[in-house]
Amino acid sequence: MIKAENLTKRFYDTVAVDHIYAEIHNGSVFGLIGTNGAGKSTFLRMAAGILKPDEGSVTVDDETVFENTKVKARCFYIPDEPYFLSNGTAEDMKVFYQGIYPKFDAARFDKLLKNFELESRRKVQTFSKGMKKQLAVLLGICAGTDYLFCDETFDGLDPVMRQTVKSLFANDIEERNLTPVIASHNLRELEDICDHVGLLHKGGMLLSKDLDDMKLNIHKIQCVLPAGVGSSDLQGIDIIKTEQRGSLLTLTVRGKREEIQTILQAYHPVFFEMIPLSLEEIFISETEVAGYDIKKLIF
C-alpha cells in the first residue's frame, strides 16, 4: 500500500503539494484529477521516489521510497513527456530497462510491440506523440513492477488505443495485482478504469473517495409528484440539488437507493425513475456540497 502523510513539496515560494494525506491500496486503480499546476506530477514523482518531500512522508508498504533502491525497483514512472535514449530505438529501451528492472519481460515486450505495430529498430524520436505514449506504456507494463505511475498517459492516444491500454492494465491488475496510479486532467478518461479518485487543486486534496461508494450513495431521480407536493415536502431525503421543468422534478440525492425509493413511493408519484449518474455528475454534486465548482477545477 502507498501511504502519503502530511506530504508537502515546495519549489521556491510555490507550494506544489500541500500537506496531502492519501492511501492507495494494492490492486486498485487510483485516479488523480486536476488541472495543470494542481500538483499531480509532483505527487507522482514523490510517490515514485524521484523527488524528496519537504515535509511529511510517502511510503510503500511502510518503507520510505526516496533513495530506497529496493522499493524504487517496484515502481515505474511514466512522465507526461516520456524519456527515451538519444537516438534510441524501442529495442534499445528494452535493453536499458532490462538492466534496471529484474522482472522485465522481454518476450512479452517484443510481442506487444508487434501487436501495437511499433517498429523495434526505428528511432523513437521519429515516432508520433501517440506512438511514444504507447511505447512508454509497454515499457512500464513489461517492467513487472508492483506500482505504475502514469502522468497524463492517455493524452495523445486515440479512443481505440486508450481502450487497448486500459485492457492491458486490467489484465495485469487481475494476474499480478498491479497498482496503477493515473493522473489526468480529464475525468471522463478515468471513469471506466478507476476504483478510487482523488481531486487535486492548488496542491491540496479536495476530495478522495471510492467510486463504488460514490455511485451507491448519490442518485438522480426524475419524478412527477401529485398536485400540491413539492421537493420541500419530501421528508427523510438528503437532497443535494433540485431542478424543476414544468411538472417534471429532477433531484440529485444522497443515501441508500432502497430507502429513497421507499420514501418517495409513499408520496404516490405520478411518475418516478432513478437514473444512473456519470462520474462527472457525481463529482459535480460532491464538490458543490463542499463549496467548489468542479467545472472550474478540471474542465
Describe the function of each predicted region.
Residues I2-A4, K9-D195, L199-H201:
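ABC transporter nucleotide-binding domains
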Residues A16, E67, E189, G230, ...:
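Short phosphate-engaging motifs
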Residues T69, K215-I218, L264, T287:
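Short, flexible helix/strand-to-coil boundary loops that buttress conserved ligand/catalytic motifs
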Residues T89, D210, I275-S278:
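Short loop/turn segments at beta->alpha junctions
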Residues V165-G255:
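ABC transporter nucleotide-binding domain
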Residues T252-F299:
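C-terminal coupling/interaction segments
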